[in-house]
Amino acid sequence: MTNQSTIDKLIKMRLTAMADAFRIQMDDPTMKEVPFEDRFGMLVDIEYSNRKNNRLKRLIRQAEFEQPDASIVAIDYQSGRKLNKALISRLTTCEYITEYRNIFITGATGSGKTYMACAFGMEACKHYYTVRYVRLPDLLLDLQAARDSGTFSTVLKKYPKPVVLIIDEWLLLKLTEAEARNLFELIHKRRKKSSTIFCSQFRESEWYQQICGGESTLADAIMDRISYDSYKIDIESIDPSKDLSMREVYGLDPAMAK
C-alpha cells in the first residue's frame, strides 16, 4: 500500500487532520528515527484535537451569542461595579450546570449583563455543553406564533434541548396572561434538567409584578420553578456619577450593547 493510498483512505474516512499530519511526517526525514507507536500517537492526538476544536466552533456558532467575543477573563473588576469575583470564578467551573441550577444576572442598562451571560455561555461551550442565546421578546413571539399556527408542541421542544439557555431582556416588559402561560410551559420543561441564565434590569423581588402584574398564579408557578437554589449576580454601581457603560469598558458597538 502506497502512502498516497493511505492518505486517500484517511480523507474518505473524514480523518483529514490525521491525513495532513501523516503527509507532513512522510516529508520529514527526521521522523524515520521516531518509533512507530510515537508517530501513530502524534497522528491520533492531532486528529483528536482538531475534532474537539471543530466541535467547539460549532457549539459557539449554534449558540448565536449576542456578544460572541465575551470572555470571563476579560471581565473588568475595576470598572466601578460591585462584582462578586469569587462567585463568578466558581461559576466558570460550570458545576451549576451539573447541579441544574440557574443564574440571575441583574443590573441597570449598560451594566454588562449580556456580556457576562455570554461569557458564562462561552465557558459552557468550552466544556462542550450546548448553549442557546435568545432575547425574551423574540422567544415570546416565537412561542405565540407557534401557538397560533398549531405547532406549539413542536417549537417548544427546541428550547429545552440546550443544556444552557440564556434569556436576555428578561421581563423587560410586563407579561400578558398568554405570554406567561407559554413561558411557564417552557420553564417547566427545563426544570431540573438544565440551567438557564436570566438577564434583567429588574431585581428578583420585582419580577412578580412583571408577570401579569403579580396577580396571576402563573407568577408564583414561574418563580417557584426558577428561583430555588439559583445563583444571583447583582451588578451594582459603586458611584453612579462616575459610571462608564460596559460598552465603553469593553469597546463594544453601542448598537449591540444591552
Task: For every predicted segment, state its role.
Residues 100-116:
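Walker A/P-loop nucleotide-binding motif
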Residues 70-94:
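N-terminal pre-Walker A segment at the start of P-loop NTPase domains
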Residues 16-67:
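Interdomain "pre-motor" coupling segment immediately N-terminal to P-loop NTPase/helicase cores
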Residues 101, 128-130, 161-164, 191-198:
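Loop/turn-to-beta-strand initiation segments
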Residues 121-134:
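Post-Walker A helix-loop "phosphate-sensing" segment adjacent to the P-loop in P-loop NTPases
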Residues 81-89, 131-160:
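Short glycine-rich substrate-engagement loop in P-loop NTPases that contacts/grips substrate
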